[in-house]
Amino acid sequence: MKREDVLMEALPYIQKFYGKTIVIKLGGHAMVDQSILETVIRDAVLLRYVGMKVVLVHGGGPEITAKMQAMGKEPKFVGGLRITDPETLEIAQMVLVGKINDGIVSLIANCGTRAVGISGNDGNLLIARKMDPQRVQVGEVMQEVDLGQVGEIEEVDPEVLHCLLAQNYIPVVAPIAIDRQGMSLNINADTAAAEIAIALSAFKLVNLTDVDGVMDADRTMVYHRLALTEAEAMIGAGVIAGGMIPKLEGCMKAVRNGVASAHVVNGNREHNLLLELFTDQGVGTMLTL
């Protein structure tokens, strides 16, 4: 498609999305490749300049693991789930809030736009409870494992986000929550993004990842559009598996609770965020009712 055709195709979408709220979950290789992250941030800033209200939520699992190893603490996983003891949580907060969040805010500032970095602790944005012990398969047996300071979101108070958006800031949210006794908890970033989108009555939720979207069983074709019932059937049939399941489950919950559409997009490809939102076919998977 010619560049001028892309621009003309974008116009009605820009008009339709003006004033709408979009929650973007930053994840995948973009979190460890500075050039990819810079491109994604520029695209997010463009959305702000064309009139959308943008909220960014980021993860940071690989960076947390690297920092732990650098500090001589070996990360512990059981059945693919991280064990988060108090020291691990302290390191996670250091990485998520002190490094990644600040870095994203700085990139946004370099693009000439104002941003504020917060975590779920701020303004009681994310209230959570400690996750119950999980049954996971270890070898050939099932074990019940206490994951430590890992939380499940119980409540979202979006007031702090509304205040920032009203003042034309881009909020950048680190996935740390607080429980009702004041203890900090690590939260899955996909879940945090979905819950924030629901609380804000966002128009769109976009999950940026390392894959092109939801693929067919042969991994040769991307489903550009899926209804909730289709996605549920594909999970049940095993077509959707592995790490895509929690991402899609967050998207599905958002759509069930009022978000007009949720998208899974490969954030490693240049300007995919814009192409997904502003072209007819898109480049990832869009999930709707």
UniProtKB/Swiss-Prot annotation:
<dbReference type="InterPro" id="IPR001048">
    <property type="entry name" value="Asp/Glu/Uridylate_kinase"/>
</dbReference>
<feature type="site" description="Transition state stabilizer">
    <location>
        <position position="247"/>
    </location>
</feature>
<keyword id="KW-0055">Arginine biosynthesis</keyword>
<dbReference type="InterPro" id="IPR001057">
    <property type="entry name" value="Glu/AcGlu_kinase"/>
</dbReference>
<dbReference type="GO" id="GO:0042450">
    <property type="term" value="P:arginine biosynthetic process via ornithine"/>
</dbReference>
<protein>
    <recommendedName>
        <fullName>Acetylglutamate kinase</fullName>
        <ecNumber>2.7.2.8</ecNumber>
    </recommendedName>
</protein>
<keyword id="KW-0067">ATP-binding</keyword>
<dbReference type="GO" id="GO:0005737">
    <property type="term" value="C:cytoplasm"/>
</dbReference>
<comment type="pathway">
    <text>Amino-acid biosynthesis; L-arginine biosynthesis; N(2)-acetyl-L-ornithine from L-glutamate: step 2/4.</text>
</comment>
<comment type="function">
    <text>Catalyzes the ATP-dependent phosphorylation of N-acetyl-L-glutamate.</text>
</comment>
<feature type="binding site">
    <location>
        <position position="186"/>
    </location>
    <ligand>
        <name>substrate</name>
    </ligand>
</feature>
<dbReference type="InterPro" id="IPR041727">
    <property type="entry name" value="NAGK-C"/>
</dbReference>
<keyword id="KW-0028">Amino-acid biosynthesis</keyword>
<dbReference type="Pfam" id="PF00696">
    <property type="entry name" value="AA_kinase"/>
</dbReference>
<comment type="similarity">
    <text>Belongs to the acetylglutamate kinase family. ArgB subfamily.</text>
</comment>
<keyword id="KW-0963">Cytoplasm</keyword>
<dbReference type="InterPro" id="IPR004662">
    <property type="entry name" value="AcgluKinase_fam"/>
</dbReference>
<dbReference type="InterPro" id="IPR037528">
    <property type="entry name" value="ArgB"/>
</dbReference>
<dbReference type="GO" id="GO:0006526">
    <property type="term" value="P:L-arginine biosynthetic process"/>
</dbReference>
<keyword id="KW-0808">Transferase</keyword>
<feature type="site" description="Transition state stabilizer">
    <location>
        <position position="25"/>
    </location>
</feature>
<feature type="binding site">
    <location>
        <position position="82"/>
    </location>
    <ligand>
        <name>substrate</name>
    </ligand>
</feature>
<feature type="binding site">
    <location>
        <begin position="60"/>
        <end position="61"/>
    </location>
    <ligand>
        <name>substrate</name>
    </ligand>
</feature>
<keyword id="KW-0418">Kinase</keyword>
<dbReference type="GO" id="GO:0003991">
    <property type="term" value="F:acetylglutamate kinase activity"/>
</dbReference>
<dbReference type="GO" id="GO:0005524">
    <property type="term" value="F:ATP binding"/>
</dbReference>
<dbReference type="InterPro" id="IPR036393">
    <property type="entry name" value="AceGlu_kinase-like_sf"/>
</dbReference>
<keyword id="KW-0547">Nucleotide-binding</keyword>
